[in-house]
C-alpha cells in the first residue's frame, strides 16, 4: 500500500483510531478499475479519476500534499507492485490524528493508495443470470447537503444503508 509517499506492507499500513476522518467522515476517495487487455494492464480513465480526486479534496478542504503526477504514479505502481492485471484501486485522502471538532485546521492530510484483486462487482454470474433489484427506503442525500460530484467518505453512509436494506 502506498501511504504518505512510500510503499509499506499491508500489515504496516495503519492509522490512528483518533483519525479525524474516522470520527467525522472527512475524507475523499476514488474507486478505479484496472483490467487485463491485449496491450497489458490498463487503468480505466486514470486522468479523470485523479482529477476528480483532487476536485473532491478541494471541495472538502483537504490539501493533498502531492501533485497529480505523484498520485498517478502511485496508482500505477500499486497495481504493478502487487502483480495485478485485473484490480480495484482505492486512492484515499483523509485527515489524520490531531484536534477534534468540526474545523480540522491543523490536522495533517494523509494519502493512501491500495490495489487488490476484485472480480465482477455484482458477482460472476450477474452478466448471464441478471440480478434482483429493489427501491430502497433510503433517499439520496440532497445536493444542498453534499457536493454530488465529490466522492466523500461520509456521503457513502447513505449508499451503505441502501445496500444493507436491499440485501436484507
Language-model segments: residues:
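Helix-start/capping segments and mature chain N-termini
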Residues: 1-66, 73-77, 100-168
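Short secondary-structure capping/junction motifs at helix and strand boundaries
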Residues: 63-68, 80-92, 122-123
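Short, internal active-site loops enriched in acidic
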Residues: 94-99
Amino acid at each position: 500500500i502506498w501511504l504518505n509517499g512510500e510503499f509499506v506492507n499491508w500489515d504496516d499500513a495503519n492509522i490512528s483510531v483518533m483519525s479525524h476522518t474516522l470520527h467525522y467522515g472527512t475524507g475523499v476517495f476514488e474507486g478505479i478499475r484496472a483490467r487485463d487487455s491485449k496491450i497489458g494492464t490498463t487503468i480505466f480513465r486514470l486522468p479523470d479519476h485523479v482529477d476528480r480526486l483532487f476536485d473532491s479534496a478541494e471541495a472538502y478542504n483537504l490539501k493533498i500534499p502531492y501533485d497529480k503526477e505523484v498520485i498517478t504514479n502511485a496508482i500505477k505502481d500499486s497495481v504493478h507492485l502487487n502483480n495485478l492485471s485485473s484490480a480495484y484501486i482505492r486512492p484515499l485522502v483523509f485527515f489524520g490524528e490531531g484536534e477534534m471538532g468540526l474545523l480540522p485546521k491543523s490536522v495533517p492530510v494523509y494519502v493512501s493508495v491500495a490495489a487488490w484483486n476484485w472480480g465482477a462487482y455484482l458477482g460472476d454470474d450477474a452478466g448471464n443470470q441478471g440480478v434482483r433489484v429493489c427501491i430502497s427506503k433510503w433517499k439520496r442525500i440532497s445536493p444542498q447537503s453534499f457536493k454530488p460530484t465529490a466522492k466523500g467518505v461520509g456521503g457513502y453512509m447513505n449508499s451503505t444503508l441502501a445496500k444493507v436494506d436491499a440485501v436484507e
